Amino acid sequence: MMPAHGGDIGTAATAALYWGTRVRPVRFGRRRGHHEEARPVALEQTLQRIAAGKVVAIFRGDFGGMETDIVAAMADAGLTAVEVTLTSPDAIAAIERVAKAFGSRLAVGAGTVMTTAEVERCAAAGATFIVSPNRDVAVIAHSKKLGLGSFPGCFTPSEIVEAVNAGADAAKLFPASALGPGFVKAIRGPLPHVKIMPTGGVTPEVARAYLDAGAWGVGAGSELVNKDVMAPGGLDRLRERTAAYLAAVRGQA
């Protein structure tokens, strides 16, 4: 006998199985008016962009409103992902400017996000992934509820497993300089399915070693984006520095 019809997803799924069809769950994101916006495509695109480029450039500090100029220089050099930390002055406005200008071709994220309220603000500004220095299950869950990528900070195998079990898309290994590529290689043995992104003190040479050890990508802060960009000729030097960093990471140097 065919199962009875009803209005809930469980009944719909049962009926679909009866007829040999398949129901895909709908994931929801930011509210627009009285509706929810489905964002699985945006999330998948974000993860693909980071995986393709291997490097997330991190803004931390005051760059005098030059964020879009800085991102343009790095994008010209081949960068595919950027993170603006909430410790930067006027960070939400900066995220919004960068997302509006580059969201169609770069993954634009927010860093140092430590509360669910901050997740909401970053999502509204256009961020498509959330990075934290710590592992907070509530922040992970809220990021996923809004259809955003979630990269919480982890330092131990237990924290990595707990983060992934809570729904994290990747574990930000932080501070990576205290652990090194050997840690990534060791952790990939029992946890080959986990995406690991070392961040903190990641020079081009060390970045290549992390990737060779099995890292999914790396986060680069002052190694790429620093106060030199505000000096005369700084954007040209940033473009060259970014190109050299990416070449080293991709084994082309």
Task: Kindly give the residue locations of the regions a language model identified.
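Extreme N-terminal basic, low-complexity initiation segments
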Residues: 1-9
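Glycine-enriched alpha-helix->loop->beta-strand junction motifs that scaffold or abut catalytic
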Residues: 75-80, 102-105, 124-130, 145-151, ...
